[in-house]
């Protein structure tokens, strides 16, 4: 999603992870959501798709399934919309931690005195209905690690 200002760091991290694990990464950029149908059609034969969370989860999940592409996103809403899985920081925990920071600041702690923290809780959500529709079997070792399994 070229207009998304986070696409460059997103792709950079994806490329780094791909090269470290020996996985070939191919980028497909779009300018508008109306380009998604053509973009997904061009992905025929790919092993999997990682969808930027700034795109419509309903549309991208539907296109992933229609083109029989296993798909993942950092949006927890993605599997609920029909995508295969999401793996990302827990937004609920980020909001909670933000509120705790704000509380400390309002009580007089200088923001510069607070430690910088990254997300602590990472969530894995798997949609087994989509896995079955794609002819995939999710190993039990993955299912037991999932925070939520949609059946």
Task: Indicate residue ranges for each PLM-predicted region.
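Short hydrophobic alpha-helices and adjacent helix-cap/hinge residues
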Residues: 1-151
